[in-house]
Amino acid sequence: MNKIEKIQIPNIKDTSLLVVLDSIELEKTLGYHDLFLLWSPTFQKAGIPVYIVFPDEPNQLKEYCQYYNTYIHYVSDFELIKRLDCIQEKIVFGKKYSVILSKMYVVHNGYLFEEQKRINNKAIKKLYIKALELKFENFIKKNKNSVDIPNILW
């Protein structure tokens, strides 16, 4: 069993995408956020909700994200970021800093299934396909062996 599969996210019951990003005020985070805004209709059509977790205060998120009417859920939960091991200590010129690493996860039945440490179109596509496979796994298993091949194809 993978390390991430042991982490339970009880608040998320459906198959969904969980994204951890740094503060909403950073330029790099805004770039990632824009990428998810582009992917939002695709996830919405598939019925896969996207949860983005920020370390910011809820008021800060509410002010910023009230302009977007998307399928993205904005969450302020620093404890979850710690549980997912997304905080890294860096030393710059002898001074310690905490940096939040951007990561994406597929959540299925309350457990993490897949982790992606890079956020780009290719990585989002990979997790989108994995989420679709998990969401429709029972349908695929049921119909995989029951499909009849027409005699013309023999």
Indicate where each model-derived feature is located.
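Short, flexible active-site-adjacent loop segments at beta-strand->alpha-helix junctions, enriched
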Residues: 56, 78, 87-90, 110, ...
